[in-house]
Amino acid sequence: MNARLRPWRALAVVLTASGLALGAAAAAAAPGQPSARSGGHAARAVTAPAASTCDPKASSLRPAGPPQVTPGTFMAKIRARGYLVAGVDQSTYHFGFLNPLNGQIEGFDIDMIRAVATAIFGDASSAHLHLKAISDEQRKPDVMSGTVDIVAHTMTISCDRLKYLDFSSVYFDAHQRVLVLKNSKATSLDDLRGQKVCATTASDSVARIAAAKAIPVPVTYWTDCLVLLQQGDVAAISTDDAILDGLAAQDPWTKLIGPPIADEPYGLAISKQHPEFVRFVNAVLQQLRTNGQWAASYRHWIGTPVAPIPQAHYAG
């Protein structure tokens, strides 16, 4: 491997190792450093949803009004407990990552979930938000079992997941793309037929990699993919451009290639047992869209220009 990659490889290893050591829970986020990133999330013409009866972008419940905690609701139970339990990522730079300098999990997703906690408790105290670091594979079972109240984990709203979980309205529009080393001759996923392409085990990307006749290499964390790419063990990484942008920021010897492969609309995952909580969360997200907080968070964590704010569409 080229020696110039080693410092960046070391950073990826540190982030992965420290993330694994953190385990189940972490403290609330502290302000981080903004990234220098050039957009890339504007709306584009990409693959349409596979099922005509399902529209992931218009599958959530309409808010009943401003976010309010009324007696007997799930939000009231959370308030009585004293804290919201959120399943989050700890290895996706910009969105949910463990900052090795302060030991805090921080990022765009964390800002979204912190706003939900603030709306429930009426203040932004970190004591009211418990962050539980989970892998991609843990997202669905942890929501369904009640291990967490909500998941903010770069989680794509899909027709399959909607069978088991409810989601908020779309809070971020991403698109699946491909990341390779800068010396790669590949220009799209189609050029990687017969070659190894990394993705996390529970991501939607794995099936699309296989469909392109590439060889999926599933791992637990996205930083594991970056290490494999740097070591030459895989030819590429394919997932949401939001995640790939974070990996590219950690290694300047990588580049994104090809057109968008599929839409990846992100939503906050919630149990189907708590529709009132879905409506509450959607009311919070609507406030973030209109009061400037969404744009401020994007600017802080992801950079400029700020992408168009995803507009809410509801099923009922």
Please tell me what each predicted stretch does.
Residues 118, 125-191:
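Acidic, polar ligand-binding/catalytic clefts
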Residues 1-18:
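N-terminal export and membrane-targeting signals
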Residues 47-50, 56-151:
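Extracytoplasmic small-molecule ligand-binding "clamshell" domains
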Residues 22-47, 58-60:
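C-terminal region of N-terminal signal peptides and the immediate post-cleavage residues
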Residues 41-69, 203, 268-306:
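Extended ligand-binding regions for polar small-molecule ligands
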Residues 42-44, 172-180, 241, 245-284, ...:
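Periplasmic-binding protein-like
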Residues 84, 144-153, 231-240, 253:
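Alpha-to-beta junction loops
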Residues 94, 105-120, 155-158, 174-226, ...:
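Bilobed "Venus flytrap"/periplasmic-binding protein-like clamshell domains
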